[in-house]
Every structure is written in structure tokens, then in C-alpha cells.
Amino acid sequence: SVLSSMGCGRVVVIDYCTGVTASLAMRPWREWLRTYRQQQRGTHYLSAPGSQDITAEVCIDQLALGVGEADAIRSQAQWLQLWGIDELVDEGRRWWEEKASAPDLRAMTGRSRVREAEALCDPAGLGAFTVLEWVAGP
């Protein structure tokens, strides 16, 4: 497996996930098998072959069978918070507040950072991903 060949390190998977494969049978298939074209939801997966991306939710139970249980399973927001997104947002907010009356590039970057973090942590939008981590070594 990749983990045993690494020695030490971390494998991070970021994707749409569901815990148990059987739960997909209880949901409409268009929720867990999706198509995208030009950053928009696509049409039926067979209606325009080769013109859209097809993606399916990753079933965590299937990954566990192949590589073992993940060491950590978090929402995208939790993972970003773990790695300091709140501190980056606070810094951006300070930059904006310092120069809001006459914004420079740094202030605009700070303001943008706040809005981007909101989007990346929104579980109904760009933040709908799950983050799985496997750690190898000490």
C-alpha cells in the first residue's frame, strides 16, 4: 500500500464523501452521481458523452477496505480551521480595517480573504467536501 511504502508522511483525500455505500441506495442517484460542464451542473451522464465531467461520491467504507480506516475524517471547514484559516481571516480583516477608507492591494486582498473563507467553509457550497487523512510513520 502507499502508506507502507511512504515510511512517514500523510495522505490527504478531499472529495464528496458518504460514510456507508448502502446509504446511496436511499438517495436519488443524481445526488451522488453528478455531472459538471463549464463549472455548472451538467445533464444526464449519458446525454453528452465526452462533453462533461462525471463524478461520484467516495464511499468511506470502501476506502477503509482497501487502505484501512482513516486516521481523521473532517468536514472541509474543520480541516481548514485546523490548518489556520481563522487566523488568516482575522489577519485579512485587520488589513481591511486599517485601510478601508483608502484601500490598497493588501487591504483588498484581506477583504477578499474573508469572503473566500466563507465560501470555502460553507457546507452547502464550496465547503461541501470531506477531508480524510491517513498518517504513516511516527
Predicted feature locations:
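Long, Lys/Arg- and hydrophobic-enriched amphipathic alpha-helices
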Residues: 1-138
